Design a protein with these regions (language model features):
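Glycoside hydrolase catalytic-domain context in secreted enzymes
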Residues: 1-280
Length: 280
């Protein structure tokens, strides 16, 4: 590859890469931020609600400050309870694009079913608790089949696994494009082609949703490398961003709107952002 030896980062660029692009203030007006408001709304009432539904404001105003802080601090996979809005503690998200992995049945399902778990519930002390769920071939192998129907069935199978462990959200599919063969997450990303990536990932997501599992495509966007992915600034031009990186995600976000014959029009219900900056 060609080396660029005469390029120097400006002081402004260095400042932005170091994250010095905002000022932390301690004297802002916070009078409009409300906690502990009286009300009897519960989180479950917002199922299917629009993002701009004004009821969100009412619900969030009921939160206790500690609950809000805990949601931010622990909002990865396991969430703490928020009694003020009837939100139950549980493990609500998990990786990944090639199947729900990393843990056995018992560790995933221990508290997502409440006091009356279904017959297939597997407790942590069950002799089969360490059994895991299906892990599928890597994303490039799936994309290499050029078979959207196969990706759809893969999504359905992973969605079925999610039913066994009470998992509502999956961090996947991986929909970045292969800009470099050295990207540490390429095994989770389909290809270098945005249309192939978008169509296969879209079918995966629709299949998962057929079983009630919300697929959240990742890592939106421009996740070029795994090392130092938190804060690194991938370099790309707007044309590359629009025609390749964002195009793949666009297909997934618009998802079921592409096929009126199937009578589906839900779009995507989740997304996982990248941890990088965008551009120099």
């Amino acid at each position: 590859p060609e080396s660029y030896t005469d390029m120097l980062a400006s002081a402004e660029m260095v400042d932005r890469i170091n994250g010095n692009n905002y000022e932390i203030k301690t004297d802002d007006d916070v009078s409009e931020i409300v906690f502990n408001a009286e009300g009897d709304m519960v989180f479950a009432e917002m199922k299917g609600a629009d993002y701009d539904d004004p009821r969100w404001e009412t619900l969030l105003n009921q939160l206790d400050l500690t609950e809000a802080l805990n949601f931010i601090l622990h909002g990865n996979r396991e969430y703490l309870a928020m009694p003020s809005v009837g939100f139950l503690a549980g493990r609500y998200t998990e990786n990944g694009p090639n199947g729900i992995g990393g843990r056995g049945f018992g560790s995933l399902s221990y508290n997502n079913f409440g006091e009356n778990p279904p017959e297939w519930y597997i407790s942590e002390d069950d002799e089969n608790a360490s059994f895991g769920m299906n892990i599928f071939p890597s994303a490039p192998v799936v994309a290499s089949t050029f078979n959207p129907e196969l990706a759809y069935e893969q999504g359905r199978l992973i969605g079925n696994d999610a039913l066994f462990v009470g998992l509502p959200i999956l961090w996947g599919p991986g929909m970045n494009t292969h800009r470099s063969p050295y990207n540490g997450r390429n095994g989770e990303y389909y290809s270098e082609d945005p249309i192939l990536t978008g169509v296969v990932g879209m079918e995966f997501s629709i299949g998962a949703l057929d079983k009630g599992l919300i697929a959240a495509p990742k890592h939106y966007a421009f996740n070029d490398q795994e090392t130092n992915r938190t804060g690194v600034a991938p370099y790309l031009e707007e044309q590359r961003a629009r025609e390749v990186e964002l195009r793949a995600f666009q297909l997934a976000f618009e998802a079921t709107k592409y096929d009126e014959e199937r009578g589906e029009d839900v779009g995507m219900l989740g997304v996982m952002a990248s941890f990088s900056k965008i551009g120099p």
